[in-house]
């Protein structure tokens, strides 16, 4: 299974998710990124569903709230894919 995921810093949390842009025009300040299947990553690399207390598997956020976006390590990506199954 080929999955393109990103590791991003959002609200002082590390999140691994599939990131897409919102289609169509958006106004400044409007959410413009979709995080699909987001999981929070703790310091040991364990994953937990994000956001907590929600069953939503797609979360729309503002790209301006993302402070860092990088590719996840191979181990983290493998753990993420396993969590999706």
Q: Where in this protein do the model-derived segments appear?
A:
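Conserved RNA-binding domains used in RNP assembly and mRNA/RNA metabolism
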Residues: 1-85
